[in-house]
Structure formats: structure tokens, C-alpha cells
Amino acid sequence: MDPQDCTCAAGDSCSCAGSCKCKNCRCRSCRKSCCSCCPAGCNNCAKGCVCKEPASSKCSCCH
């Protein structure tokens, strides 16, 4: 299981799996599955992208 909170610095690797469930994950190794909270209806995020920031009109996995 992934830790609930990654403490690694931005760009560093960490123990997160590809499904990254960390609240504050900034690691390059697992950022691909983490994104800002997406607007309602973002299909990409609904497919497993972990919400890690307050909701916004844009996110890293749906443009």
C-alpha cells in the first residue's frame, strides 16, 4: 500500500506505486497518476487520477 503522505522533495523518487495515493505527492516517479482536483465531469481523473489539490477549472490529466 502506498503511504498516505509522501514527504519526498519535488523531483525526487519515493515509495509511491504507480497508483499514487499520497496526499502531497510531488515526486517525479509517481506524479503521473496524481493531479489537481479536476472539475466535475473530468473523465480522465475519474479513471484513477488521484486528487491532491483544491478543485480548479484545469488539471494536469485533462486539458
Swiss-Prot record:
UniProt keyword annotations, A-Z: Metal-binding, Metal-thiolate cluster, Zinc
Belongs to which family?
A: Belongs to the metallothionein superfamily. Type 1 family.
Source organism superkingdom: Eukaryota
**UniProt: a divalent metal cation 2 binding residues:** C8, C14, C16, C27
Where are the stretches annotated Beta?
1-30
A GO term, aspect molecular function:
zinc ion binding
Where does the chain bind a divalent metal cation 5? C35, C37, C38, C51
Q: What is this protein called?
A: Metallothionein
Look up and give the organism this protein is from: Gallus gallus
Residues annotated to bind a divalent metal cation 7: C51, C59, C61, C62
The record's section on InterPro entries has:
Metalthion_dom_sf (IPR017854), Metalthion_dom_sf_vert (IPR023587), Metalthion_vert (IPR000006), Metalthion_vert_metal_BS (IPR018064)
UniProt region (Alpha), positions on chain: 31-63
Identify the PANTHER family for this entry. METALLOTHIONEIN, METALLOTHIONEIN-1X
Where along this sequence does the record place binding of a divalent metal cation 1? C6, C8, C22, C25
Report residues binding a divalent metal cation 6. C38, C42, C45, C62
Describe its function.
Answer: Metallothioneins have a high content of cysteine residues that bind various heavy metals.
